[in-house]
């Protein structure tokens, strides 16, 4: 039980450090926003709904395609590379934590993120990305996106069960809701 509690705390730290930001970046660029629009409704979920969503997402391949043209592609990729590079040490420290062997799906997510980081780092001039190369990177992002959403729902269920006072902030800053606002309203 204590090992799983520590593992859940590591996952929570991941979302605080980088996971929520990745979801926000990927979701804002996703051509298929409708495929995740139901994730705006999380304030109304109970444990049964979390379990239902986790079961649905376990092996799901969520519709995803970066819908950015021309010069904005390079800007998106440069910003993504900067984010990943700034969190590289954190990600490597996470993946070196032996407790993560207990959570194979999360380890797979970290490996996918580090792979994308490496792909972007090996491209010194992201302004020169061809459509074919961009499509390859889009595939890497899609792989991360599906895993990231599953782990995010798992994380929310954990917070809802063990730390319900913490989930309020997540709901107010929901990365799937472009109108989300951290401020508490009447």
Task: Describe each region flagged by the PLM.
Residues 2-87:
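Membrane-proximal, non-transmembrane interface segments of integral membrane proteins
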Residues 76-186:
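Soluble C-terminal extramembrane regulatory/interaction domains of multi-pass membrane proteins
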